[in-house]
Amino acid sequence: MNTRFLLLLCCLSFTTFSQPFDAIKQPNRSEEEVTQLAEDFKDWSKASNGWRYSFITANEKEAVEDFSISGYQTANDYLRATDTSTWGVAGADARQYIRTVKSALNKLPKYKGTAYRGTWVKLSLLNKLEEGDVLVEPAFTSTSTLPEVAKRFSVVHPNSPQRLKRVLFEVKINQGGHTIAGLSEYSKEAEVLFAPNAHFRITQIERTSNHTYIGVETVKASAVKNTQKYNLYSGEEVEASFWHSLVCT
């Protein structure tokens, strides 16, 4: 079997037989190994393009490429905004861009397996989270199949007046994840992207003084009933009427 393919299998099944959070707690592998694994994931992504990919447009490809560079900032700012009425023309442009990226995702390979995300979360939200709660991200959610990449995104504390804490997510992806590694300008990130409004059910939480480790699994919105649900960005409890107002149309 090809050595590079073996490395890719190792990457994709890093935590198959390990305890929760083992992979993300391990010392980082060498930069050379991480780069090679990312390259292998990029190759796998390209090889996994199905019939839907034949319908992807040049505009959609460009939108995904731009998303990984800077487009994510405008798109996610708009999706997370509580009031978009002041955006004017920029709001219309943002909505069109979001629709284009979402359309592209539906034509890119699906990924099922484990991925990771490093970020900062409001301490007020973390303090009330319990196993079984559902986190809803109104914006696009970026993850990586490489824990080393995920950890890089939680190194620098954001400039925010809110009290934040570093969080490392281990994500069991059952549905909703699409690899953009074959198109992304930052293909070394082995990125798996979720469209807005992704739902993640908490399966495990481990709190330490420096980090909070959270294990989640993807769930369909329709499957979430009688469960505490929080907006991952704002920390607010999500009500049904409020949630529908977040959907980008």
UniProtKB/Swiss-Prot annotation:
It catalyses: L-arginyl-[protein] + NAD(+) = N(omega)-(ADP-D-ribosyl)-L-arginyl-[protein] + nicotinamide + H(+). The keyword DNA damage does not apply. Its main location: secreted. GO terms for molecular function: NAD+-protein-arginine ADP-ribosyltransferase activity; nucleotide binding; nucleotidyltransferase activity; toxin activity. GO terms for cellular component: extracellular region. It is found in: Secreted. Transmembrane segments: none annotated. Residues 1-18 form the signal peptide. It is an enzyme of class 2 (transferase). Changing E191A: Restores 40% growth in yeast. Keywords: Glycosyltransferase, NAD, NADP, Nucleotide-binding, Nucleotidyltransferase, Secreted, Signal, Toxin, Transferase, Virulence. Pfam families: ADPrib_exo_Tox. Residues 31-223 form the TR mART core domain. NAD(+) binds at residues 68-80, 117-120, 137, 191. Its EC number is 2.4.2.31. Gene3D superfamilies: Toxin ADP-ribosyltransferase, Chain A, domain 1 (3.90.176.10). The active site is at R117, S142, E191. A probable mono(ADP-ribosyl)transferase, it may ADP-ribosylate Arg in target protein(s). Upon expression in yeast cells causes cell death. Belongs to the Arg-specific ADP-ribosyltransferase family. This is Putative NAD(+)--arginine ADP-ribosyltransferase Vis. The lineage of its organism: Bacteria, Pseudomonadati, Pseudomonadota, Gammaproteobacteria, Vibrionales.
